[in-house]
């Protein structure tokens, strides 16, 4: 069981909303309207940890260890939404998301294979870590830069915890886990080949609600994410390459193989079905 160890490890590095964020360093002259608007949209997006947690608990009733870890993940992800909202409450209260705007991103996700979802969210944590690090470089106001740097580290730790559960799944389910992880790994490491931002909040998850069945489609400004990535923080091919490299590196360690490209991972995936 991983939950007790992960709980203690996460407790040791948990940051405090009041004490650890340097609220007094705020510089109003270094926050643009454009930047402030994106903070609101990320606060709403992070609120989608709520329906994601409901999905995880529903689809992992067979796994109480992982379900218990969700109590940690949910707490920390909701705190990401909260710290962004606290920033707006203090410095741009006119942009604070309404309860209705937050509730709009809570909807039911269709059931999906638990191992594929685990891998999808592992890759999502890697991607979000890089998005937030890139956002911290784009922002000019020191407090929001610190916030993005702080929550980026959380996302990296979450990815590390998911990797622990992936290792456990290899022991308990063997090839089923290998197939699931390789399949989703090929998809999520191939983002340079698609214009779509490959993150769980930007994927269709409820067929009955299509096309209004991504988290991003239910935000006040659908399409903001692509603009944020492409035109604002400029998450370019260099950053995207770093995401793919981290996914391939971790799968190399997980499978005791060497994947230097998506093509090599895809060949491995095909070999599993042979």
Where are these regions (language model features)?
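Non-heme di-metal
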Residues: 1-274
């Amino acid at each position: 069981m991983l939950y007790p160890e992960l709980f203690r490890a996460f407790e040791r590095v948990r940051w405090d909303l009041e004490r650890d964020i340097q609220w007094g360093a705020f510089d109003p002259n270094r926050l643009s309207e454009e930047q402030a608007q994106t903070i609101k949209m990320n606060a709403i997006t992070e609120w989608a940890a709520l329906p994601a947690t409901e999905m995880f608990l529903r689809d992992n009733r067979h796994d109480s260890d992982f379900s218990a870890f969700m109590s940690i993940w949910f707490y920390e992800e909701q705190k990401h939404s909260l710290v962004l909202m606290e920033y707006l409450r203090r410095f741009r209260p006119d942009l604070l998301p309404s309860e209705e705007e937050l509730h709009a991103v809570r909807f039911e996700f269709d059931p999906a294979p638990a191992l594929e979802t685990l891998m999808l969210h592992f890759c999502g944590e890697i991607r979000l870590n890089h998005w937030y690090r890139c956002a911290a470089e784009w922002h000019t106001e020191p407090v929001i830069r610190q916030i993005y740097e702080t929550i980026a580290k959380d996302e990296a730790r979450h990815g590390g915890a998911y990797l622990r559960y992936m290792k456990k799944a290899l022991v308990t389910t063997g090839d089923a886990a290998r197939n699931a992880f390789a399949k989703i790994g090929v998809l999520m490491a191939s983002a340079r080949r698609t214009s779509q931002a490959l993150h769980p909040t930007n994927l269709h998850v409820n067929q009955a609600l299509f096309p209004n069945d991504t988290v991003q489609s239910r935000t006040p400004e659908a399409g903001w994410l692509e603009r944020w990535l492409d035109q604002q923080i400029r998450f370019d091919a260099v950053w995207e390459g770093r995401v793919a490299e981290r996914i391939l590196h971790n799968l190399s360690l997980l499978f005791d193989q060497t994947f230097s490209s998506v093509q090599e991972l895809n060949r491995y995936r095909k070999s599993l079905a042979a």
